Amino acid sequence: MQLAKQYIPNDYEPNIYALWETSGALEPTGVGKPYSIIMPPPNANGNLHIGHALDMNLKDILIRYHRMKGDDAVFIPGADHAGFETWVVYERELTKQGKSRFDFSRDQLYSQVWNFVQEKRGNMELQLRALGVSASWKHLTFTLDDKVINTVYDTFKKMWDDNLIYRGERIVNYCTKHQTSFADIEVEHKNEKGKLWKIAYPTLDKIGEIIIATTRPETMLGDIAVAVHPDDERYKKLIGTRILLPIVNKEIPIIADEYVDMSYGTGAVKITPAHDPNDFEIAKRHDLPLESVISPEGKMINVPAQFLGLTPVEARTRVLEALEALELRRGETEIEHAVGHCYKCGSVIEPMIKEQWFIKTQSLAQPAIDALKKEEIAFYPASKRKELIAYLEQLKDWNISRQIPWGIPIPAFVNENDPKDWIFDTRTNEQSIVVNGTTYIREEDTFDTWFSSAQWPYIVTDYLTDGDLANYFPTDMIETGMDIMRAWVSRMIMLSLYRTGKLPFKEVYLHGMVNDEHNQKMSKSKGNVINPMELVAEFGSDATRMGVISGRAPAQSQAFNKGSVIAARNFCNKLWNIARFVEAQIGDNHQIVDLEPQTPADHWIIRQLNDAANNIAVRIEQYRFSEASETVYHTIWDDVADWYIESSKTAINRPLLSWVLATSLKIAHPFAPFVTETIWQTLNYTDGILMREAWPTPEKFDPIAAEQFEQLKLLVAEGRWVIAELPGNKKYRLLYGNDSLIADNQDTIKHLMRLEAIEHTDQPRGLRLAAANREAWLDIDSETLYQHQENLEMRLAEARQKLAGLKKRLENPTYVEKAPAHLVEETREQLAEQEKIITRLVSELEVISLK
């Protein structure tokens, strides 16, 4: 088989992936040191986005590298039922059909969503394959598989028995549109402009008043007290008395509580415990009643007739009008404050009293905190470890129940005659069960998806059941987005320590968000979401993989740059053309034999590839993915293609040329697996596949000879630069004096510099190539040299003018602080480039002046 003239990724990628899969190369071998990474399960019902492409690519680089290093590497895939996210999508489908969730029973809805997800699930797996994700597909775990549900139930039962589970009335974050609660960490807080209204609450004799300040006047209809600080001299005499709640005309007490900030507002706070978490805690301390005025459907309840059935926003307007009529409004102030929203639909979250299932987190968090303080898990970046400790130290109890039918049912049943009598039972497919003559009704809520996801490391490795992957737990590392460090990483650590006594992984690498080209967060509403499959279709999987990691550092969000994908596509084409050149010299019978370097270029390329293989390995192991990829790019493009391949055209060492290509394919494989495997298979390097080849080990070379080629490079590079700057388009002669290196490598220098001739001389003339520090001159006449000098002086003036403009821009604090970060960085890069140009031009002009 022969390499085609052009590399068209779509012609090869599906077949290459099929080869990996059918050969068993994706599966663990049981030979070597176990190395495992789990896949944060993407939503089974959806398409991958560009963030998934980054996430999966980083993990796949590690897996491919460790396979080649001889480790028994396994990438364990997963698919997430994505409880709430999937439910939102399916509710949209029902709406299109003119139906509602309330038209069906819970069991009917579960069955419908199950079928919906199974239809979509294959699409996600196909996309992961298209990205080249080398996962062990026979170990794929779906978050609703029996083994997942059984483990989740076992954990829930253990927590139940350990008195870590409780059901109680608490303030929860509630989305009235989807009618489900959320944990604190799932609420998306947005800074919004609003108003702080001051309202007078009259004393019972209607002579005096207390002024409170609130951003939500509508909730005053549910006030049960006014709180002041016990040390506030303004209100000390009023503590213990009662005051009149406007509109409702109900007497409520004035209480003292140290929570109140005397310096904020008027120092008097309305207490609405059913709709504010802080007020709820105050009410508990003072044994005050709870009065809900907003229903789960987002309507006003238990309020005067004129407000019944209104939305909170509608009620706000009416309440303010009523207060105006009563002459009880005392002004308003424009403010900016954080407002909680549903992270999926954007609705304002309503704090609401609901009976929910909770996990007591204090005893779970402490072992995790202790392990983190002892640095038993390495974090990249290291600063995130302290951030996670701080989060765990103030962690609240975890609300694990969701009011949606799609998910793992909570295995609990309630006595039909006693709402406080709950039992654990896994017969969740039954509406009711009878135990010792008592009928118990099934809990309708499902688990928060994070409760199962938090157990992912020991579930997918079958650690608790001693399955065939049990030896791969704890996993070696977790790589995920910094945005879910708290929601996922923290909980995996807590639950793994609780269930297994072990940490779930040894290292944590957190990547930042992939933003759009303007460095704005991507969202469907903005229409700026990038579909990686479109990039794969246009540029190929390898280009997408290399492009998406370009310039990335841990935990730093960065703009997506399509230019990086194009550059990576060009790199793949360059690698293909290198292979075609080698194929033309050797054919398709590539047997790697003992190397016999013959020229300085031969010794130099061995040194370069030895160094590259080592540097790439170090950078991968330190999670410096972008730097490793850049090393691959420049080693193959610059060292192999531009220098060695070009120099070898004058003296071909075929066995070494074959080794150079093989080594290039190996170091590039973790980053560009498809094109490298395609070349490897086409040129018949071995009977096996590249994915399972060993990572390159150092080969012997002569360092003196290698350094000689480095000196030749300096000479050629300067000669090329000068010739490119000279007027006209002609070939020049190179004159040299007593220089054995030039004398011994004339053919190579002539070819690389595209010279007319090389001649020895005892009478130097022309322009000396001074930067190379050799006795070498370009044979240039005086007129050409003068024109060259004028051109350089003109370019130097232009460069200095550009430099001044760039400096002025960067000295402007408004630009640096307010311009998009990527533009500021581009300006800094342009400034550095101009400084390099100026240095080069000044140096060249100094040589001419010496002449």
What are these regions (language model features)?
Residues 1-231, 255, 272-285, 289-304, ...:
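N-terminal, positively charged nucleic-acid-binding surface of large information/translation enzymes
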Residues 1-3, 40-48, 106-110, 135-142, ...:
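Glycine- and acidic
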Residues 20, 147-179, 186-188, 200, ...:
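Gly/Pro-rich turn-and-neighbor structural signature
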Residues 51-63, 79-80, 148-151, 209-322, ...:
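Structured ligand/cofactor/substrate-binding pocket environments in proteins
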Residues 80, 176, 182-188, 414, ...:
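Acidic, turn-prone loop/beta-hairpin segments
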Residues 128, 570-583, 602-611, 629-649, ...:
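Core structural elements
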Residues 341-345, 514-518, 522-598, 684-685, ...:
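Catalytic adenosine-cofactor/nucleotide-binding cores of aminoacyl-tRNA synthetases and other
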Residues 566, 684-851:
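C-terminal low-complexity, glycine/proline- and small-hydrophobic-enriched intrinsically disordered tails
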